[in-house]
């Protein structure tokens, strides 16, 4: 790197400088002229002060430079370096004026080689994205009510304890199957991929959690493996990834069906809390009860309307009888009224004609025959109307509940007054009322039977 230094400070135009003035001017020159840069070297003389600041020397085979990293920046590094560690430090060049020593003021640190790892991460991410493995349309929602939940992680990982604790708290009724595999190391990625494939082959879970706790980029590198990513993408079981902390992203997070910021969050996404399920069941039961009650109310209204049409068959019969009597009276009045007078006049005229014409006798006979036919026709009409009235009366009597009771039947009502049509609705010692043709009977239930001869439902009996 070539850095051009331009000294324009008026301080250097003076004839004589104090040591403090010189160090201050050199410090300002260094800070203004050299930008923030990355420096690779080996950690030595590392000290973590009580204040939280880090002091160490960064060296290689030919040179060394003192370095300081203040607490706020050190807290953002995912590891505590040790002497001998190869690291890459992002820093600004500054001067420690009291001693005139130049130093590095670091604001970032990573293990040496992380830059290469990150470049490999970006290359694989771009490749899989171009293949469509990150496409949201190919991702599936985990089952809302899983039969069982699978967990792929190390048996010794703290993440496993967190997941099991969250699942036991939220969904204790859901079985959990663990597919153990190391989460870091040379063969970790291959063994994790094998466990994902095994879970799909066994098909015993509805949701698969792939989890591990936080760590450095090297610790999480198994989850950036291409073979593991492709196995997760090809999984028939929805996969929820929960790798590291919220700020950590791995290739597996992009191909998984759902990404959780932590292992605990992955467990929470995998199941609905038991309390929410119970509340939903109660709500559904209430809706069913209301719907059933509406149907019962509608049926009761239809029954009431039907009963209103048959409230008093005897009254309808009396009305028809009254109408028949009226017709009989009108028929009798007709014979006593103008029609009777016409018949009498006809008889008189017939007698007079009989004396005046020789054929009046035959006319009288024909007239008498016609009168007889008229009488028979009127009698048949009256008989037909009487038969029709008798038929209607018989039909009305058949619909009269009192008529049914008179044939030996009875109506049974429970303590609430509802008619009992199903014996299994009652229980032993229930109070009932029995209506018969003449009166009512109060009774207590002693035994219950069903139409097939078996005893009633034992669950409805009282001990």
From Swiss-Prot:
Main EC class the enzyme belongs to: hydrolase
GO cellular component annotations of the record: cytoplasm; exodeoxyribonuclease VII complex
Location in or out of the cell: Cytoplasm
GO biological process: DNA catabolic process
Keyword annotations of the record: Cytoplasm, Exonuclease, Hydrolase, Nuclease
Domain of life where this protein originates: Bacteria
Pfam families noted in UniProt: Exonuc_VII_L, tRNA_anti_2
EC number: 3.1.11.6
InterPro entries given in the database record: Exonuc_VII_L, Exonuc_VII_lsu_C, OB-fold_nuc-bd_dom
Reaction equations catalysed: Exonucleolytic cleavage in either 5'- to 3'- or 3'- to 5'-direction to yield nucleoside 5'-phosphates
GO molecular function: exodeoxyribonuclease VII activity; nucleic acid binding
Subunit structure comment from the entry: Heterooligomer composed of large and small subunits.
Family: Belongs to the XseA family.
Role this protein plays: Bidirectionally degrades single-stranded DNA into large acid-insoluble oligonucleotides, which are then degraded further into small acid-soluble oligonucleotides.
PANTHER family per the UniProt record, alphabetical: EXODEOXYRIBONUCLEASE 7 LARGE SUBUNIT
The protein's name: Exodeoxyribonuclease 7 large subunit
Organism: Bordetella parapertussis (strain 12822 / ATCC BAA-587 / NCTC 13253)
Lineage of the organism: Bacteria, Pseudomonadati, Pseudomonadota, Betaproteobacteria, Burkholderiales
